[in-house]
């Protein structure tokens, strides 16, 4: 095996949308960094079975909706 080709694997803290935190090991960020989730299994409609509102961070959802407004409408 080649040496020094694998990324650093360390402990980070994941913050869920409801504020709960847990620690896991990851290659993301640096040791001790916090990863704040925009959407997670507790808030995603695919896992909750509902039509919850998706938080629009950075305006991505509204830009998408504006771009494809009326795309599937039947005349």
Swiss-Prot record:
GO terms for cellular component: ribonucleoprotein complex; ribosome. Part of the 50S ribosomal subunit. Binds the 23S rRNA. InterPro entries: Ribosomal_bL28/bL31-like_sf, Ribosomal_bL31, Ribosomal_bL31_A, Ribosomal_bL31_sf. Keywords: Ribonucleoprotein, Ribosomal protein, RNA-binding, rRNA-binding. PANTHER family: 50S RIBOSOMAL PROTEIN L31, CHLOROPLASTIC (PTHR33280), LARGE RIBOSOMAL SUBUNIT PROTEIN BL31A (PTHR33280:SF6). Belongs to the bacterial ribosomal protein bL31 family. Type A subfamily. GO terms for biological process: translation. This is Large ribosomal subunit protein bL31. GO terms for molecular function: rRNA binding; structural constituent of ribosome. It comes from Bradyrhizobium sp. (strain BTAi1 / ATCC BAA-1182). It comes from the Bacteria.
């Amino acid at each position: 095996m080649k040496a020094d080709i694998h990324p650093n694997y360390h402990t980070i803290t994941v913050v869920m949308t409801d504020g709960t935190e847990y620690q896991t090991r990851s290659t993301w960020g640096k040791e001790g960094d916090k990863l704040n989730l925009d959407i997670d299994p507790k808030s995603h409609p695919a896992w909750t079975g509902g039509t919850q509102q998706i938080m629009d961070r950075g305006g991505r959802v509204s830009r998408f909706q504006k771009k494809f407004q009326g795309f599937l409408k039947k005349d």
